[in-house]
Design a protein with these regions (language model features):
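Conserved N-terminal entry element of GNAT/NAT acetyltransferase domains
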Residues: 1-29
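Acetyl-CoA-dependent GNAT
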Residues: 16, 25-98, 109-111, 115
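Active-site acidic-Proline motif in GNAT/NAT acetyltransferases
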Residues: 96-102, 126-127
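Conserved acetyl-CoA-binding loop-helix of GNAT-fold acetyltransferases
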Residues: 101-114, 133, 137
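Conserved GNAT acetyl-CoA-binding A-motif
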Residues: 115-127
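Conserved acetyl-CoA-binding loop of GNAT-fold acetyltransferases
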Residues: 136-145
Length: 147
């Protein structure tokens, strides 16, 4: 597990719409999709972990009391991010594998960073090299590593 912090300042944008992707606050009607995305995206991102016992309902516990942003493209939900705002902590950021590397994660991260009142933080599994590279490309740096 590594801890990362953002050093990159973000630019205010008047609209969170780019390349037909809109970032909006979550709605209860998003829950079924986000549960499914959370389950399947974790299994794909962390194949070395035993995801057999993970359940759709894990999303509910993992995002309890967090601010959730949903990425929507042409009416289809394609990703989400959740933040524990008290600590400026990015807890989850997952994009449907079909929409990865298309800028969706960038837009979600940009929105999350706009909500931070100070330096943001996150944890990322050390073996999740793709995610680490993503955050580093966006100005985050590793503060510490551990189990």
């Amino acid at each position: 597990m590594l801890m990362a912090k953002s050093t990159k300042r973000i630019t205010e944008i008047s609209s969170i719409i780019a390349n037909t992707v809109q970032i909006r606050p979550w709605q209860e009607s998003d829950r079924p999709f986000l549960r499914t995305l959370y389950l399947h995206a974790r299994r794909e991102a962390w194949p070395w972990l035993n995801g057999a016992e993970w359940q759709l309902e894990d999303f509910d516990e993992a995002t309890r009391d967090e601010v959730i942003w949903v990425a929507v493209q042409n009416g289809h939900r394609v990703g989400f991010a959740s933040v524990w705002t008290n600590d400026n902590f990015l807890h989850n950021l997952f994009v449907d594998p079909q929409y990865q590397s298309l800028g969706v994660g960038h837009l979600l991260l940009e929105q999350v960073q706009k909500t931070f009142t100070s330096t943001g933080a996150l944890k990322c599994l050390v073996r999740n090299e793709r995610a680490i590279a993503f955050y580093q490309r966006h100005g985050w740096h590793i503060e510490a590593t551990g189990d």
